[in-house]
Amino acid sequence: MKDIGEQLYTTQVNGGPSSLTMSPKQPNRATRTERQEAQTLLYQGSEAEAATMTIATCVQCKSVHKIPTQDLRKGPGQSQDTYVCFKCSLRAVPTQLHFVNNNAGAAHVRNETETISSPVNKFKVRNFKPGKYYCDKCRFSTKDPLQYRKHTLQHEEIRFICSHCSYISYTKGEFQRHLVKHTGIFPYRCEYCDYGAIRNDYIVKHRRRVHERAGAKRPFKTVAKLEPKRTSIPKQSMELSKGPSPRAAFQNKLSDQLSRFSLHANKDKTHNLMLLPELKKYQKDVVCIPNKVTLSEPREVSLLGNKNVEVEVLSPSKEPVHPGMPLTVMAPSELVVPTNCLAQLMDVKVVNGAQQLVLKLFPLEENARLETSRGDGGTSECLSTEKGSGGQKKMLSPEASRSLAVEGNAGDFVGLDRLHSLVQKQLKNVKWVKSCNFFMPNSGVHSQQESFLGSDTIKELQKSHSLCPPRALPSAAIKSHSPASVQNSVPYGPGATVSHFLSKAAVAFADDRRGARSNSQQLLPLASLPSKVPFSGEKGLLPIGESDLEARNRISRPETLVSSDRKLEDKQMESKAVGNTGQVSSVQNKEYLHINITGEDKPRSQQPGDQPGQPKTSETAGATFEGPIISSVFSLSSGSENVPEAIKWNSSTTKIKSIELLRRKIAQLIESCGKPSSLSANSAQRRSIGQAPKLTSKATPKAIQEMSVSLTGPGPTPGPSVGPLQKPPNEDSITGSRQLVPQQVCPQFISANDGKMENRVTRKTPVATPVLIPKGAVLRVLNSSEDAHIIEATCDTPVSIPCSEAQLAGTLPFCPMKQTGSGSQPLTCRSGPADMSPGLETSLRPKSRKEDTICSATAKKMVPVYSTAPGSSDSIRQGRPVSRNLTVSKNKTKQVNSTKKKNKMQANPGRYFKDPPSFFQVARQLRLIAAKPDQLIKCPRRNQPVIVLNHPDVDSPEVTNVMKVINKYKGNVLKVVLSERTRCQLGVRRYHMRLTYQNVAETNHMKRQMMLKMKLKKVHKNNYQVVGSMPDDPAQCVFKCWFCGRLYEDQEEWMSHGQRHLIEATRDWDVLSSKGK
């Protein structure tokens, strides 16, 4: 009956004026059906009806039917194979029967007059092969006619008809793609940005391409979920960025914002334009289309780089904004979409009848680094003072996120990432909100780098600040690339003296290298700074004069929080500080985590604004605040020319369960020994410091260069030379709001001349300053318990090498910054390259004894002594702060280097401890390899560099780490002493040797050799079991190391120990052989 109906209506419908026109695909149909018919004839033998039946596609609905060939006969006005299915010919069948889409949103009603715009053959065959069948509705192709038939019949059953325009699609993907044109909603969305797609695999590819550089993802949306309550803030801040919006609105919004954060006041200050990640919340389902796509430089990304900037839409004023629409928007003049950002539609708002698109600017790449802010272009608006506004304009443009961290807190640096911690801190410190924070967003992007900070401008800034009460002060972000933004803390009361913070911290970031590059020169010239204002910027210069010392002490007061991101800037600052020494140039390009300290000047009278009773010393200050939080560790960038290649330590240090316990014991020992107060304080700090050893290790190499500069000028050289030393490794970069960076300044390198330094050392807890480790310097290798990989000179414990020769490394100033608070990241202070302590002492031996008494309890660490040409070591030594007023004698310093090789483990063990000598005589030899062909190995000369291939004294993480360190300084290791602390850590104590036996002499050599053979017991027809031999007689189960003679009870340990020897011994054979060739 169906067939008859189809035949009856075919001619009628096709001849009539029906709106259902023939498909444009029709021309392809002729060839296709001929091919199909030809193929079906081939299969006549297998199918009885193949000769009479064929497959035809309805020209109206594109459904495929199996029909007799005679049905395709030509009707009036028809081409031969034109076929209209029964349903289409009847035209009475409601569209619901065709409509298979489950989308509830799609309506099932359509105008009969509308034509069904069948898909034009979208799936044209690109690589046509004669033997294949190709589906014209999708990408399906097959050589099997049966499969093809099944497939085409499926298309008849499954169809999607658009409720908006009656478009018919045969695949879900195509239907969804079509629906997006009407609804603007993509079925799949990127969780990190507003990218939408019709297939999930597109989202996956997008995420890998855009958000997962180097495995770092940006959890913007998830973060947003964490702080639902603050959703209004970003909008307000966005409005701030909007050029047209009236100023009054800003201020109201600002006050709301501030009250929300319970900031103490400062309504006139620029609010935090830190747009929170929650920005995501506002985004509606409007399709987010990148309006501007530009590739980003990887360095410019900031975690919160996705800021919202509001712009007013001019062109489609009435119609809804659709994905493909060109938009004309009015943006603030300052708004510049940085080259590395995508602008995406976040939201569409209607304000006063005008549509406002909320565009989100986000960097294409996210380096896991938390750059606190890079202002949302345009967001920063100065609410007061022309000067401030001018300064800010410069900053405004470039970064995608512009957070003016205007918390009001002088010290408070608002890390975008740490907003809520910031809030807490602000609550705490509401009282010292007074000082005006100059926060410089990293505006390094533009060439707008006019160095805003010229010395003149600094003075002006200071002047302006002193004039206006802090409230009036806009936070003028200083725009030079050089991230040095000036922080002037303005005394709250007009009468109070103004303490200017020249603080690099304020600058929160010049993370991008670019900024560093161009602005390195723009850093404040140290000379220009008023003497009162110690430039605490990068390394704050060490004040050398007495007054400076006082200032220094005051500096300890932690005023500004630094965002950890500012690594680069400080570097730049510092480089400037260095006095434009040539070295600086290299520094600038390096990324560097940096702690900025705000140096305060002496006149800082405690003002009501300041925290009442805030202690001057950094230690007490620490009590008040939670410790700095290090948001991340940045890897060193490659090109440091001045750093010896060996110095790049990897920060992964093996952790041992006993580390914490050991740290406590050590601290107690140090304190109990009655060391100078500063030392004890440092040791206490060290405790906390040990916890984050990793952070510093990476930062150091960069800083290192600076140090060398200062050393060269031994005298009370002008600040610049000293300044570089001060480069804090910033382990601390305190990202969140929180931290004082107690003083960064490390008294360390004050030339020996200044005896005064001494005071400073005792009084202040200096911040560790990573410095160039001169090859001749004595460095401490910390045990793994405290970061074995990191070489630090520490002032905690004067290093006395326990040799009869009483060589002492001298106290190396290890100026750790006091880590305050649990959060504080351990600053592993990398202390300045310790100059050789020897220089400090007039008479080496007496001093060593004294030190020994002080430190004997304190464990001694392994100290590799590095020597280069003697001259270099000497020069290096000079910069040392003298912890005790000792005159420097270069000759003595040489003596230290000249310690005899015998002291390397060959020294009589009795000298180290009173254990039975037999064990040590067996196991105490170091195998040396000459660095140069003419060097002596058996009896190395005093200053001859030697490469230690194996250190068989002990097999442990401590010694392994020491060996790694030694290996890195291959040509420069003069002496290796295993300290008492290390030995204690190893458990090698009197009469108790780990894994070894004291009665070595009694062990029978033959029996030991026999033990190398395994004894097997046959436990089954095909099974043997290893039988432990003579378990009752442990003395017979001892294995002697073939390399060093060490004895092991466990055969497995003995084997692994031997393998390590082999690895060490053959490590550089390929290099040596290649050199020989």
Swiss-Prot record:
Its main location: nucleus. Gene3D superfamilies: Classic Zinc Finger. One of its GO terms (biological process) is chromatin organization. There is a cross-link at K479, K847, K861 (Glycyl lysine isopeptide (Lys-Gly) (interchain with G-Cter in SUMO2)). One of its GO terms (molecular function) is zinc ion binding. Residues 9-35, 372-397, 561-585, 599-622, 675-739, 825-852, 895-914 are annotated as: Disordered. One of its GO terms (cellular component) is nucleus. It comes from the Eukaryota. Residues 9-30, 605-621, 675-688 have a biased composition (Polar residues). It is found in: Nucleus. Residues 564-574 have a biased composition (Basic and acidic residues). PROSITE patterns: ZINC_FINGER_C2H2_1 (PS00028), ZINC_FINGER_C2H2_2 (PS50157). Keywords: Chromatin regulator, DNA-binding, Isopeptide bond, Metal-binding, Nucleus, Repeat, Transcription, Transcription regulation, Ubl conjugation, Zinc, Zinc-finger. A zinc finger (C2H2-type) spans 160-182, 188-211, 1039-1061. Belongs to the krueppel C2H2-type zinc-finger protein family. Through its association with the EHMT1-EHMT2/G9A and PRC2/EED-EZH2 histone methyltransferase complexes may function in gene silencing, regulating repressive post-translational methylation of histone tails at promoters of target genes. This is Zinc finger protein 518B. The gene is Znf518b.
